[in-house]
Amino acid sequence: MCANNKSALKRAQIAERNRVRNKTYKSSVKTLMKNYLSAVQAYAANPTPESKQEAQTRLAAAYSRIDKAVKRGILHPNNGARKKSRLASKLKPIEQTA
């Protein structure tokens, strides 16, 4: 850190702390999204009520984590809405054909 005074040093420390905290949240959002997408692929390959329920459960978990990230200011509200919309659009056409 190349801070020239006390307040700049403190701001740099806070920024680093927040960066690490935000990174863990963003990482968990991405992980839950990937888990959901894999469940959707499994449901598309073998459309059973159990696989549909699994996909819906994982969708709810991803929605919850995205909403919490938005609430805490880690994701912009529009970014969170876009992620949720894209997740929902993956399952919708498969449900209608099955």
Swiss-Prot record:
Annotated region (Disordered), positions in chain: 76-98
Organism encoding this protein: Trichormus variabilis (strain ATCC 29413 / PCC 7937)
Keywords on record: Ribonucleoprotein, Ribosomal protein, RNA-binding, rRNA-binding
Highest taxon of source: Bacteria
Protein's UniProt name: Small ribosomal subunit protein bS20
SUPFAM superfamilies: Ribosomal protein S20
Function: Binds directly to 16S ribosomal RNA.
Family: Belongs to the bacterial ribosomal protein bS20 family.
Keyword Transport: no
Molecular functions per Gene Ontology: small ribosomal subunit rRNA binding; structural constituent of ribosome
GO BP, one annotated term: translation
Spans through the membrane: none
GO CC aspect terms: cytosol; small ribosomal subunit
